[in-house]
């Protein structure tokens, strides 16, 4: 089958047809989808009733799987999924919605903040692929922001100001902004800040983009208040309506996005109702900047 892509937003976000993800991709299909990611940054595949194994097999066409270690406060023995996918649901191991005061639930509320997946890792994620298995009846839309278009729209003096800036990223920054500040010593070590460039250049088409995330909490060479004001201003700019596409989920949607070129967030929803979303994450291949101690 031939891969076709229909653009859904003036800047980015395409809807793919001509692919059944229950079946292995042909080499040409894999090339076409990766080229689509380079161009559109986010791709939607509708009506994909896939298993965890099929979702992971699809993801592995585009690189190696990123492990979940270092991105959660959930203990391994409490994982609901053991298939290699990331659990982005509101469900516990028993399949029921987590209590509102459950530590995992409170930590996961950070997904409602604008972010790029795994920017808190020294080598951040390349692609994320999210499959909707159970959709919440109200709310829960995911918003995506095109960081390329946002960069292009900056004033030239702002581009010059931020070109060489290096940020510190950590889950402690994003969760701390919501008042989640209680960590074990092991978690503090696991969530130690890493360094990321504020401006990234895409390895294929060479287009520049802002590399923002709620995980960013400091900029090297700046006071913390000054850095956070700049990051807030840039985030407000980058998430204006003209750069954002809102996706309303239906069951068996699969959305795939490039973390190097976008940010996203989930909107609030009724946490008493189940929402089962499962993510395969394709690992990045190199850091955005050479790492050093980010204390």
Stretches found by the model and what they are:
Residues 2-256, 260-295:
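Fe(II)/2-oxoglutarate oxygenase catalytic core
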């Amino acid at each position: 089958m031939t891969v076709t892509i229909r653009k859904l937003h003036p800047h980015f976000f395409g809807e793919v047809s001509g692919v059944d993800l229950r079946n292995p991709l042909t080499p040409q299909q894999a090339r076409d989808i990766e080229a689509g990611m380079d161009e559109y940054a986010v791709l939607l595949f509708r009506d994909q009733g896939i298993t965890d194994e099929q979702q992971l097999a699809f993801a592995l066409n585009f690189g190696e799987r990123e492990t979940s270690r270092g991105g959660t406060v959930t203990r391994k023995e409490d994982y609901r999924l053991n298939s290699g996918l990331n659990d982005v649901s509101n469900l516990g191991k028993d399949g029921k919605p987590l209590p509102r005061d459950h530590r995992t639930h409170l930590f996961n509320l950070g997904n409602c903040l604008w972010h790029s997946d795994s920017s808190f890792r020294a080598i951040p994620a390349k692609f994320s692929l999210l499959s909707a298995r159970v959709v919440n009846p109200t709310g829960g839309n995911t918003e995506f922001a095109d960081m390329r278009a946002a960069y292009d729209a900056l004033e030239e003096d702002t581009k010059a100001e931020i070109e060489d800036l290096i940020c510190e990223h950590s889950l402690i920054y994003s969760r701390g902004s919501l008042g989640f500040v209680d960590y074990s010593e092991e978690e503090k070590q696991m969530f130690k800040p890493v360094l990321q460039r504020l401006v990234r250049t895409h390895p294929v088409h060479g287009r520049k983009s802002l590399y923002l995330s709620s995980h960013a909490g400091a900029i090297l060479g700046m006071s913390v208040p000054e850095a956070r004001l700049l990051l807030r201003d840039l985030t407000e700019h980058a998430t204006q309506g003209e750069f954002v596409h809102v996706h309303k989920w239906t069951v068996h949607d699969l959305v795939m996005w490039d973390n190097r070129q976008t940010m996203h967030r989930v909107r609030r929803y009724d946490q008493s109702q189940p929402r089962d979303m499962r993510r395969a994450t394709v690992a990045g291949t190199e850091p955005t900047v050479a790492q050093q101690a980010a204390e």
